[in-house]
């Protein structure tokens, strides 16, 4: 059986985009655990973060910043605490202190993801301004560039950017993949 599986770096990148665009406690919790994981290739994570961030529906990834990392105490008490043991936040001095500590650590460790090179900015400008996918300025290996350029979400994004720029304000229709029929 051939089952496609996402690379761990793509999964981490998806969490990094969610961390900034949703500002949810669960994403901050995950990010804090991720920054402690050994053997991650942060260059791959950055490339995948740019790909996923550029694909975001209503967020301009060029404006992403480590300062956007964080969450509200109410999100922890309303959603995250039910997934953790009762006294999880006590060791940190409570949920507010946990947010302060973890936010500072994540902002420091993840800051390089938001420091764009000229090539990375050119990639984002191409996607978001002209509806073009050209990953070559990013300086990533050919296999990574090919994966970025083939990304379905990014292709849908550029289709919408082109339509929007031409005056068509309706979103492009998403096409569904045909179901596979197993023998």
Where are these regions (language model features)?
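Structured mid-to-C-terminal alpha-helical surface segments
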Residues: 1-183
């Amino acid at each position: 059986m051939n089952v496609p599986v996402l690379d761990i770096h793509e999964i981490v990148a998806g969490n990094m985009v969610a961390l900034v665009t949703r500002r949810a406690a669960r994403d901050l919790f995950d990010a804090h655990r991720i920054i402690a994981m050994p053997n991650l290739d942060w260059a791959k994570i950055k490339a995948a973060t740019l790909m996923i961030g550029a694909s975001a529906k209503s967020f301009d990834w060029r404006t992403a910043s480590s300062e956007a990392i964080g969450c509200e105490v109410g999100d922890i008490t309303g959603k995250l605490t039910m997934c953790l043991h009762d006294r999880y936040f006590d060791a940190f001095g409570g949920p507010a202190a946990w947010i302060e500590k973890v936010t500072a650590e994540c902002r420091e460790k993840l800051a390089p993801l938001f420091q764009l090179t000229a090539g990375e900015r050119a990639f984002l400008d191409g996607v978001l301004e002209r509806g073009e996918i050209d990953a070559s300025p990013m300086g990533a290996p050919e296999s990574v560039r090919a994966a970025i350029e083939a990304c379905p979400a990014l292709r849908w994004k550029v289709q919408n950017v082109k339509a929007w720029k031409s005056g068509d304000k309706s979103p492009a229709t998403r096409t569904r993949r045909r179901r596979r029929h197993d023998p």
